[in-house]
Amino acid sequence: MVKKKSANASASIARNKRATFEYRIEDKIEAGLQLMGWEVKSIRMGKVNLSDCYVYIKEGEAFMHGCTIQPLNTASTHVICDPIRTKKLLLKRSEIDKLAGLIERQGYTLVPLSMYWRKGAWVKVEIGLGKGKKDHDKREDTKEREWKIEKARVMKKDKENA
């Protein structure tokens, strides 16, 4: 008998680790993606890179640019596979208007944080609304992260000695 996968076993497809280092994320939004067939197949194989990706709003629609989806070798020959094709994000009009206002007036940036499967069949993108960090902010975050690691190491050593 075939064993079923749990719902959370492979829900995550890709994460943008640079986004949390480069930006201070204040809000997160879930959006759908308008994809082609070969892109879905490549995503199922895990050939996605979100590192140089960003979201922009143009004429009342949201688009994700810079997301690299590598085509499979077995992709169809009659379809032109562009790995860095701009993908349309599926958001409600009210969400797009709210985000556009924040971007234009308050200097926020939209950055994709992660890509994951919703209900096993739909690809969703988690978009972070944030502001860019300065160099000193990045250094503080690095020091804080290193301090947490060092503190955990010391605590573990104390438990072993006790």
Curated annotation (Swiss-Prot):
Gene Ontology CC terms: cytosol
Domain of life assignment: Bacteria
Keyword field: Cytoplasm, RNA-binding
CDD domains, alphabetized: SmpB
GO terms of biological process kind: trans-translation
Compartmental location: Cytoplasm
Major place of residence: cytoplasm
Pfam families documented for this protein: SmpB (PF01668)
HAMAP family, alphabetized: SmpB (MF_00023)
Membership in a protein family: Belongs to the SmpB family.
Protein function: Required for rescue of stalled ribosomes mediated by trans-translation. Binds to transfer-messenger RNA (tmRNA), required for stable association of tmRNA with ribosomes. tmRNA and SmpB together mimic tRNA shape, replacing the anticodon stem-loop with SmpB. tmRNA is encoded by the ssrA gene; the 2 termini fold to resemble tRNA(Ala) and it encodes a 'tag peptide', a short internal open reading frame. During trans-translation Ala-aminoacylated tmRNA acts like a tRNA, entering the A-site of stalled ribosomes, displacing the stalled mRNA.
Entry protein name: SsrA-binding protein
